[in-house]
Structure formats: C-alpha cells, structure tokens
Amino acid sequence: MKLSVPETISNPRDFLHTSVPQLTDLDSLLRCHICKDFLKASVLTPCGHSFCSICIRKYLQKESKCPLCLSDLTESMLQKEFLVQEICSSYVKLRGSLQKHLTISSQEEEKDNEIIISDEADTSVGTKRGTPDSPSLSSVSTKKRKHDGITTLLMKKKTDHPQRQEKKAQCPICSKHLPLSELEGSHIDECLNKGSSLERSDSFEILDERTPSPSMESSHQPLEEKTSLPSSHLLEVKEKKDITYHNERYLNSGLLQQKENRLPRLDFQSLSMTQLKQKLASLALPSNGTKQQMVARYKHYEMLWNSNFLDSIDPVDENELKRRLSSWEAKHNTDHSSDSNSITNLLRGNKRTNAISAMIKLFKSDRFDRKGWMRHHTSTFKALKLEAQRSDKLAKMKKEELSQKSDANSEVSSEPILKIDQTSENN
C-alpha cells in the first residue's frame, strides 16, 4: 500500500540554490510557525507574532501561551491581519515563477561545481613557470569532480589566465583576505583540516574533505585542489548571516525586554502653561512658544516615542527621536525654531557643554588647550568686544548730551539777569 505524498512540498531552502538566496528569509517570514506552511487567514498576537487563525486557535485550546515567546495569550486577544494575508497570497502566486527564473540551470550548475585537481611534479629551481618545454606541464594530470548542495555558491571552474597583478579574495572558511595564489594553494585544505572537527550547520556546510583516489595516492607527488576564488562568487560569512537575519530577529523578538514605559497622553485643557512647560522640561524638550505650539510638540514626540520604544523591533535612542522632532518642527512649527531654546540649539548646546567641561578639567594642567579655548569662545569674545564698544559709545553720547544741556541751561539762566539790570538802569 502506497502512501499518498504531495507532488511538491515547498521549503524556504528551495531558494538557497538560486541566484538570490536571500529570498529564503522572506519565504520563512511568510510561514506559520505552527504548521510551517504559508499563512492562511493571518492573525496577530499582542506580542507581535503572526499565525494561521485555525492553527493558533487549536494551539490555544491546549495552552494559553504564545508558541514563540510564551507570553500569556487568549483567543480574544487575536487581531486580523488583512494586509499580511494579501501579501502572503500574492507571494504564493509569484513563488513558482520566481523559483523558475532564479534557479541556476543544470548546465551552469555542473560548470560551477567542477574542481580541477592538478598533480604537479617537482621542477628544478632554475626552471621557469609557463615555458613550453617545462616538465611540470607534461606531468600534470587533471581530474574533475562534482559537488552538490551549497557548494554551487562556493565553487567555480578554473580557467587559465595570464598572470596579472596579485589580487586578494576572502577565504570562505576563515574569512581572511589573502592573495589568490595562496588561496589557490594549500590554504583551503589547511582550513578544512582545522575545521573538520567543528560542528557545521545543515544549511551552510562548507566543502567536505574528499579522499583521493588510489591512483593519485600511488604517485608520491603533492595534490593541490585548485579553484578560482573571486569575491563575487563567494558566499561570505556576512552574507550567510544575512540570508536568515530577519527571520531569526523575528523569532527572537519575544525575548526583547521593554525598557521604556509608554509616554502618556495629557489632558491639555486642564494643564496650565507652567505645568505644560514643566512636563516638556522633564523630557528635556524646549518649552518655548505658545501653548498651541507646545501641545503640538508634545503630541508629536509622544507619537515618536511610543512607536519607537513600544512597537519597533530595533528602537533608536532618545537623541535620534529629538533630531526627528527637530526636523518635523522646522517644517511644521517654525515660529520659534530659531530661539535659543529650540531643540536643535539644545542638542548643539549639549555637545558644547561636554567639550567645555573636558577643557575645564585640564584648565590648571599643562595639557590645557589655550588655542582651542580661544577658538571655542571666539564668538563670545567678539560679542563682548562689540558690547563694550557700544557701551563706550553710549557713555560718550550721554556725556555730550549732558554737556549740551548744561550749556543751554546756563544760557537760559543768564538772560533774566540781563533783563533785571536793564530795568534798573532805566529807573
């Protein structure tokens, strides 16, 4: 009796042997982690994980916890995800075409898997490489062997090229950048011998050590497994991690601990200007402008804060949030953006105070940077100089005004005396 087996069983690893192996990550993300098939009627949990509706409901009948992060979960907490469902359905329709167009053809695969193993005889010291009558060329015997699996991404048929300027490439085993001549020599064999005792993952297994044929063992000449290693055809260690980076980050998202609390909404009608300014100051935000502008500033920062620290899988720090707020305020809340209390100036001020405090620590030592101190305070010195010149001018102007007034008063006071003298003479 034969069991009925589906004709095709899809697997995220189907894309490992294509020209875009990173699609493995996308394929895994669109699958339910209970049934391992593509999401159907996707629902979202409060902890941010997606499952098929029927799968998670069956699971919750046995245990009231999220299968991935073990957070408390009930059916009433599940939310519909129409967008994810449509994305998944669209991908399922395109998956076959993607795999067909991106899969490397069998002929190219055979060419890429071929390794030329050359057995070179020892030559005399004076013999030059590449001469027509060189004994090494006559004693070379080649044998082609095929590798399967992930090695299609690691190996390429060796072609004879004239010797050019020495180039470097990255070793797929130890990830070191070495000259091609060294990599084509015994370096890879040494790396494989060292790493043969280490455990390797099923998805990214590097070349297995192969035992040479008896005919090759009989000749007491060194064997060299040669392969050209251009960086464009190597699956580097970084790229291997990138293939499953998003999927692993999603699976580990439940382990992330929420460090920051939710920023609450405020009842702005009941808050006075003083209370609102105190609230902004407690968040290290500027408290300038009208009440309407301060309310808009707080609302936008509240939105940035909660979406970053509560919903993002990769949150940024507070300084980045304040930079985003500054950018938003420059476009939508510009009346007081140039004030000394604006966000941009506050951020700049923090950097300046840090630099000044570092200088002050060295003020009494020989390491004090006097020129740096002068450069840092050049604008302040200029402002003080201009202010002193203005005050000097004002003082001179006041003196002149006072002297002019005193002269005018003396002239006015002398006129009645002259009149009195004239009247006395007439009498």
Swiss-Prot record:
Pathway: Protein modification; protein ubiquitination. GO terms for biological process: postreplication repair; protein monoubiquitination. It catalyses: S-ubiquitinyl-[E2 ubiquitin-conjugating enzyme]-L-cysteine + [acceptor protein]-L-lysine = [E2 ubiquitin-conjugating enzyme]-L-cysteine + N(6)-ubiquitinyl-[acceptor protein]-L-lysine. Residues 212-221 have a biased composition (Polar residues). Zn(2+) binds at residues 171, 174, 187, 191. Residues 113-122 have a biased composition (Acidic residues). Residues 160-169, 202-211, 392-404 have a biased composition (Basic and acidic residues). Its EC number is 2.3.2.27. One of its GO terms (cellular component) is nucleus. Gene3D superfamilies: Classic Zinc Finger, Zinc/RING finger domain, C3HC4 (zinc finger). It comes from the Eukaryota. It is found in: Nucleus. Belongs to the RAD18 family. This is Postreplication repair E3 ubiquitin-protein ligase RAD18. It comes from Kluyveromyces lactis (strain ATCC 8585 / CBS 2359 / DSM 70799 / NBRC 1267 / NRRL Y-1140 / WM37). The lineage of its organism: Eukaryota, Fungi, Dikarya, Ascomycota, Saccharomycotina.
